[in-house]
């Protein structure tokens, strides 16, 4: 059976296309190395470091107290993982829009980039972290939450076991 040059070219194109697709997928996934360019420990430290800066800024802007914070790995759409520091606090009741603007201004002054896209909370970014601040009336009068999150990433092996079985731990934040 003779193979025409058209068939050979078609197979070569298909092979090249598959190689290009495999390369693109590997580049996008980061090779399983973790979010923010690091492993589990580096991502936890970076996110916690960002929280140690952002949460006190929000606390001061809101004149809040009763701050509690914890850190834990969270699933991103059941496909990958991100590390999150979650803080709750109580602030004097006031005009929510004014309070949100005060928080946003304070964080922007501290070097965060405003990335807010919806009402009733503020979202800012810095390097590989996102901070989101919002009132939380379901928690009681004057309740607010601050989430500081790493970007989502895939992990494998021991790192995957660690993030899948992580339990929340208290984080002490200076105010």
What are these regions (language model features)?
Residues 35-85, 165-175:
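Compositionally biased P/S/T/G-rich terminal and signal peptide-adjacent segments
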Residues 21, 69-70, 145:
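Residue-level signal for mature regions of secreted extracellular proteins and peptides
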Residues 29-33:
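Bacterial signal peptide processing site
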């Amino acid at each position: 059976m003779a193979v025409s040059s058209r068939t050979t070219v078609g197979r070569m194109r298909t092979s090249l296309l598959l190689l290009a697709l495999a390369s693109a997928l590997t580049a996008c996934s980061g090779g399983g190395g973790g979010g923010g360019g690091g492993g589990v420990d580096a991502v936890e430290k970076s996110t916690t470091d960002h929280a140690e800066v952002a949460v006190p800024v929000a606390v001061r802007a809101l004149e809040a107290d009763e701050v509690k914070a914890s850190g834990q790995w969270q699933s991103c759409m059941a496909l990958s993982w991100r590390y999150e520091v979650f803080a709750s606090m109580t602030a004097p009741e006031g005009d929510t829009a004014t309070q949100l603007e005060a928080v946003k201004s304070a964080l922007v002054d501290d070097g965060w980039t405003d990335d807010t896209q919806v009402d009733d909370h503020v979202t800012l970014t810095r390097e590989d972290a996102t901070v989101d601040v919002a009132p939380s009336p379901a928690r009681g009068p004057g309740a607010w939450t601050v989430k500081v999150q790493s970007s989502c990433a895939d992990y494998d092996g021991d790192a995957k076991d660690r993030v899948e079985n992580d339990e929340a731990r208290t984080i002490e934040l200076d105010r």
